[in-house]
Regions:
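Class I SAM-dependent methyltransferase SAM/SAH-binding core
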Residues: 41, 47-97
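C-terminal helical/coil "lid" or tail adjacent to the Rossmann-like core of SAM-dependent
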Residues: 3-4, 206-262
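Class I SAM-dependent methyltransferase Rossmann-like catalytic core
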Residues: 3-22
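A conserved beta-strand element that flanks and buttresses the S-adenosyl-L-methionine
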Residues: 109
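Short catalytic micro-motifs in class I SAM-dependent methyltransferases
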Residues: 112-113
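Conserved alpha-helix/loop element of class I SAM-dependent methyltransferases that forms part
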Residues: 20-37, 53
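Conserved catalytic/acceptor-binding region of the Class I
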Residues: 139-214
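A short glycine-rich, Lys/Arg-flanked "PGG" loop and its adjoining helix->strand segment in the class I
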Residues: 122-134
């Protein structure tokens, strides 16, 4: 099996992927907390980078928890935190099917996860509101790529690859997604107003701060590893199995060309939301 396909199927290499996007936003997100929490729960904690950053920022943290669906990423998180001398309780769990916990937290965070919960984000919002201390803070990030014909963010690169591989004409790409039963990222990332409507059913939104997030890579190979670790085989239904490796190579070349032409692969607005539980929810 080709190494990049094996990586995509296992979602390995996230430690390198997070260096390109998530870690650079870590301080920006934690800056929005506005409190010095004694307890923190990170939802979709990945390899534990935000937990590690929080432990260093707030040395008086008494309870540090993380929940992650991927067993591989949980093991990597345990190793990273253990190596830094940080004690944390890490649980395996599906964010859309979490059991109730006895604990409540002063700070609950969730970064670079929301789009994977579509269209059931409210299940998580409801759960988070019920596990937040009365005066606690819920921080999460959302991405809002420009979406043409419903295709945005990573969809744009995938669409270009499909066209270059002769698998779809430009005007047929959206239809190809529909035929494959695959939701584009441009659909998974709700518009800010539509998202706010759902958030405000469970929280008071204190603030929303946004900035552009540019993806930059050194070369084609680095982009392929990023795509494999971040999206796995999500887009595989669009491509014949015998051409999946070719698709990764094509994506890498497109990313490299964009770097040469624009100095970046893509740019997507990202927002960090600071929320508090509504009365009766916490």
């Amino acid at each position: 099996m080709n190494a990049i396909i094996e990586q995509a199927r296992s979602l390995d290499g996230y430690q390198d992927s997070s260096e390109l996007l998530q870690r650079r936003d870590q301080d920006w997100v934690l800056d929005r907390a506005g409190i010095e929490p004694r307890s923190l729960l990170d939802l979709g904690c990945g390899i534990g980078s935000l937990l590690l950053g929080a432990a260093r920022r707030w040395p008086d943290l008494q309870r540090l928890w993380g929940i992650e669906r991927s067993p591989l990423r949980l093991e990597q998180a345990r190793a990273q935190l253990r190596g830094a001398g940080v004690e944390a309780r890490l649980l395996e769990g599906d964010l859309l099917d979490l059991p109730p916990l006895a604990e409540r937290f002063e700070l609950i965070s969730m970064t670079a996860v929301l789009h994977w919960l579509y269209p059931d984000e409210e299940r998580l919002f409801r759960w988070a509101a019920r596990h937040l201390e009365a005066q606690g803070v819920f921080l999460f990030t959302s991405h809002h790529p420009f979406a043409e014909d419903g295709l945005g963010g990573e969809d744009d690169l995938v669409a270009q690859a499909l066209v270059e591989m002769g698998l779809a004409a430009p005007e047929r790409v959206a239809a190809l997604y529909a035929e494959a039963g695959l939701l584009p990222m441009g659909t998974r990332t709700r518009g800010r107003e539509a998202l706010r409507e759902r958030v405000e059913r469970h929280f008071r939104v204190d603030s929303i701060v946004s900035r552009p997030a540019a993806l930059r890579v050194a070369d084609s190979a680095e982009y392929q590893r990023f795509h494999a670790a971040t999206f796995g085989t999500y887009f595989a239904p669009l491509v014949p199995a015998t051409r999946l490796e070719e698709c990764f190579v094509r994506l890498g070349r497109i990313a490299e060309r964009r770097m040469q032409a624009d100095g970046q692969v893509s740019e997507i607005p990202v927002s960090v939301w600071r929320c508090r539980a509504r009365e009766g929810e916490a």
